[in-house]
């Protein structure tokens, strides 16, 4: 709220640090090998991240791999709030530059983040991403990322569904869950979700 922001701005930085908890350092999940492909590990077994105790790095690594792998056809993602220096956005730009079809459903009416989201939308579009803005009179709070791959003559999916924004800063502050899965039924649900959002079918 505006009263909270006014109070927060009125506290000197050094005093704010004294009043805050010691920052928690997120860990890399024990059952994920940091030296192996995250995509291949998710294909073998679902992975559930619990922020802020688990770090966001496994999801970022998943996106980086998707941006580079030749079998990845597309990345679709919903965005409500991004960090000011967003790693997610830069990876999406890299993916588009590598010829992937990148679709971003951007919510421009995220409270207090409107200007930041407009700036990121322009950068994403300039990088070749397809940016859509949802449906009039509705906000999109969904947090979902769908990676579509072609394996032989079949499509397969890696889907990430979570409760938290794709914001590396707040992922270290708020309690959220993030599921990464290769389940086909969830991937098909994700594909249907994005298709319906593209045509405004709610």
Where is each model-derived feature located?
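N-terminal localization/anchoring segments of enzymes in phospholipid and broader phosphate metabolism
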Residues: 1-202
